[in-house]
């Protein structure tokens, strides 16, 4: 299955993501720490300056310190200066490492927190569009690539660039003619880096896409392991995984080939320059234009400049990985938030619901049909309304409009006579409790799951568990309500997970309930107890019930039958059976299945 990571996109309103664009986006995070950063850069500058100090000490030692006639002062101060230089370098190196690590980790913390906050406040469409593996990859792993850029790349760019500048300055001081030969290298290297840089950027983006696809295959296989095993799908999944892994390896090798060209080509150009320098230096020495100390100092400085140049060449690959990671990170940060709604407060709703000419579509379909088409109905406070109809008729979409998971394409949804966008989104959702057929539990205690989003009160948790027919089961557990339920409640049975989700809705005590196939996972005995608890709970509360099993909704005050996104029938269970329409047809089919 091909999954394109739609989070990855150019950032900052530019045609392409570049280091300059990324730095502009990072500036708000860097600004509060700018003086710490400046101190770190100054410490790096001190480290870079010590590189030029090494050949600078060699020249007087060779010119004035060697031999029986050598200057004693030079013989003494040069070794002492070497020790002092090494000590200063060590202190500056430690200071720069600590200060830059402080800055980068603080930025990493701020980025990761902002990414998670933005993710959790995005609309439902974001979670439908993106795979979990892509989002996890961006929040947990890709942000570390930016840390790599902030640390490794920044240290390399600043420290080694300054080292090159200091060494070039010293070379000009020693012999400007020879230095011009070295300087010719730099434009050649810059052109070479630019060519390799563009190719690496493209390869890194494609590599990131394949990495997300590989993570998605693992996510699917782990999540659907039962289906994989019962259908003997191991060979198919292994084949998918191996094929994509080989493609990923191919891209990695292409990146290695492209990135690895920079260093040997740089060394080759440097060797040509060294050969020319040696030739000219020999000619100058014959004319007494240079000394042995000056020549050795020049060659030493020139050789010392090669190492930081290599580092600057090697910075391409991590830099391009960082740019690709930045696209994911800022792509997530730039995701639009859910609308916060109006400023109208809603302490506790009476529960009156109105759908007025509501239409909704997830996108443009080939036949132009909408998921919901001009739906209108009202629900009185405390009324229980059931939604029935064949699969795909729009039942779940309809109830998803109530907590504003989506907004209608046209028409208005009202609670207590007020359009939903006028309410604060937080206040609106406080009025709604939902139990879905896809039970979601968190890897926490039973009490924390029951009171999710609120402060757990043991008496309230116990009452909710009793109402959901789960209290005796919980008290039999070693840690009671403090028992950890595991990943999505894997330590509980299917029926226990369903009842725990119902207990969560009971604990919330919201005036509006949405029950989406709420008892479908229960055995007959548990369903009987839970149904009784739900009937008690629903008294005085507005309830919307979705069920594929019609027996669940027979006792509803009113049943709305949907087909093709429209309400085609409305009435009580008995009235709809007497009409002999779609509801009666569905009831007859299910009755025959149950009898069979």
From Swiss-Prot:
The chain crosses the membrane at residues 34-54, 80-100, 138-158, 164-184, 263-283, 292-312. It is an enzyme of class 7 (translocase). Disulfide bonds: none annotated. Keywords: ATP-binding, Cell inner membrane, Cell membrane, Lipid transport, Membrane, Nucleotide-binding, Translocase, Transmembrane, Transmembrane helix, Transport. CDD domains: ABC_6TM_MsbA_like. Residues 353-589 form the ABC transporter domain. It is found in: Cell inner membrane. Its EC number is 7.5.2.6. It is a multi-pass membrane protein. It catalyses: ATP + H2O + lipid A-core oligosaccharideSide 1 = ADP + phosphate + lipid A-core oligosaccharideSide 2. ATP binds at residues 389-396. Residues 38-321 form the ABC transmembrane type-1 domain. InterPro entries: AAA+_ATPase (IPR003593), ABC1_TM_dom (IPR011527), ABC1_TM_sf (IPR036640), ABC_transporter-like_ATP-bd (IPR003439), ABC_transporter-like_CS (IPR017871), ABC_transpr_lipidA (IPR011917), P-loop_NTPase (IPR027417), Type_1_exporter (IPR039421). One of its GO terms (cellular component) is plasma membrane. One of its GO terms (molecular function) is ABC-type oligopeptide transporter activity. It comes from the Bacteria. The keyword Methyltransferase does not apply. The keyword Calcium does not apply. In MsbA the ATP-binding domain (NBD) and the transmembrane domain (TMD) are fused. Belongs to the ABC transporter superfamily. Lipid exporter (TC 3.A.1.106) family. Involved in lipopolysaccharide (LPS) biosynthesis. Translocates lipid A-core from the inner to the outer leaflet of the inner membrane. Transmembrane domains (TMD) form a pore in the inner membrane and the ATP-binding domain (NBD) is responsible for energy generation. Homodimer. This is ATP-dependent lipid A-core flippase. It comes from Burkholderia thailandensis (strain ATCC 700388 / DSM 13276 / CCUG 48851 / CIP 106301 / E264). The lineage of its organism: Bacteria, Pseudomonadati, Pseudomonadota, Betaproteobacteria, Burkholderiales.
